[in-house]
Amino acid sequence: MQRNFRKTFVGKVVSDKMDKTITVIVDIYKKDPLYGKRVKQSKKFHVHDENQEAKPGDLVNFMETRPLSKTKRFRLFKILYHSKSAN
């Protein structure tokens, strides 16, 4: 099945306390329409991590998928950077 049309995001893992699920925060910079200043906005996603590889602090790439639970609509695609912290 072709997966080219699914949305992908890059974010930082903030929690791995759930079974096969990680919480990832994605920072988005938007320009204020009136003043032109860049404003940082954050959004948290619950991402399915089948092999439980990602740890807090890791930079991950994840993609859209079918609904896996009430809150999970994304799955882990690739770990881009492993964090050095012991958490």
Swiss-Prot record:
Cellular-component GO terms for this entry: cytosolic small ribosomal subunit
Presence of the UniProt keyword Ribonucleoprotein in the record: yes
GO biological process: translation
Entry GO MF terms: rRNA binding; structural constituent of ribosome
Keywords: Ribonucleoprotein, Ribosomal protein, RNA-binding, rRNA-binding
Gene3D superfamilies xref list: Nucleic acid-binding proteins
Record-linked InterPro entries: NA-bd_OB-fold (IPR012340), Ribosomal_uS17 (IPR000266), Ribosomal_uS17_bact/chlr (IPR019984)
PANTHER family xref list: 40S RIBOSOMAL PROTEIN S11 FAMILY MEMBER (PTHR10744), SMALL RIBOSOMAL SUBUNIT PROTEIN US17M (PTHR10744:SF1)
Function summary: One of the primary rRNA binding proteins, it binds specifically to the 5'-end of 16S ribosomal RNA.
Subunit structure, interactors included: Part of the 30S ribosomal subunit.
Family affiliation: Belongs to the universal ribosomal protein uS17 family.
Protein name: Small ribosomal subunit protein uS17
